[in-house]
């Protein structure tokens, strides 16, 4: 059923500041004095409040006027309509504000004539704090986002880069080993051929030196007489 009566008003009433030992029967007796009731519901977890619903919204308004601030179930209760603008109880009024004194000083700047919440320095501080907080939050968000993105990129690019670098290193080391072994073998063969050629050339040179003909002896004219080729004929 609707909580609004035929006159269009609110039929449910909120009851606050109830004690933990509040009973349903005592609430029904207190509120049924103003009119017939539909339901009475008491909160248990957490305790301390209840809802009473009337059949007529005018009875609900009368109960709010008559029972607000009264002692029910051993405690002074607060009674108001459950929706709309709540009716303030005389026990829930805020404390009266201190009257303005021109001789009072502001504890922010030490000047007279205003309080801290009206001070221009206090308003500047609040603005700077809010700006610094928003700036630090945006910085933290940007840093966390960029860090997470860089981590994802690193994790994605790390495995192919590592595999490529490992394969390149292996191929380079193998080629270097091959070239080094080939150069060592070539140098060894060259040194051996050079040593052999040297060993062979040495005795040949000595032999050639020993076999070289001795210098020709020059025959003096006083030597043995030359033989004439043919005797002269006498006619």
Curated annotation (Swiss-Prot):
Per UniProt, the CCHC-type Zn-finger stretches lie at: 104-120
Mark out the compositionally biased spans (Basic residues).
123-180, 187-219
Cell compartment(s), UniProt:
Nucleus; Cytoplasm
This protein's UniProt keywords: Acetylation, Cytoplasm, Isopeptide bond, Metal-binding, mRNA processing, mRNA splicing, mRNA transport, Nucleus, Phosphoprotein, Repeat, Repressor, RNA-binding, Transport, Ubl conjugation, Zinc, Zinc-finger
Which GO cellular component terms are attached? cytoplasm; nuclear speck
> Is the keyword Transcription assigned to this protein?
no
Cross-link for Glycyl lysine isopeptide (Lys-Gly) (interchain with G-Cter in SUMO2), residue positions: 24
Annotated region (Disordered), positions in chain: 123-235
Occurrences of domain RRM (ranges): 11-84
Q: How is it modified after translation?
A: Extensively phosphorylated on serine residues in the RS domain.
Report the residues modified as N6-acetyllysine: 24
Q: Which residues carry this modification: Phosphoserine?
A: 32, 163, 165, 167, 181, 183, 189, 191, 193, 228, 230
Annotated region (Sufficient for interaction with NXF1) at 81-98
Task: State any GO BP term from the record.
Answer: negative regulation of mRNA splicing, via spliceosome
Which family, according to the similarity comment?
A: Belongs to the splicing factor SR family.
Please name the PANTHER family in this protein's record.
RIBONUCLEOPROTEIN RB97D (PTHR48038), SPLICING FACTOR, ARGININE_SERINE-RICH 1-RELATED (PTHR48038:SF3)
Relate the protein's function as given in its record: Required for pre-mRNA splicing. Represses the splicing of MAPT/Tau exon 10. May function as export adapter involved in mRNA nuclear export such as of histone H2A. Binds mRNA which is thought to be transferred to the NXF1-NXT1 heterodimer for export (TAP/NXF1 pathway); enhances NXF1-NXT1 RNA-binding activity. RNA-binding is semi-sequence specific.
Quaternary context: Found in large molecular weight complexes containing CCNL1 and the p110 isoforms of either CDC2L1 or CDC2L2. Interacts with CCNL2 and CPSF6. Interacts with NXF1. Interacts with YTHDC1.
The name of this protein is Serine/arginine-rich splicing factor 7
Highest classification ranks of the organism: Eukaryota, Metazoa, Chordata, Craniata, Vertebrata
Q: Which gene encodes it?
A: SRSF7
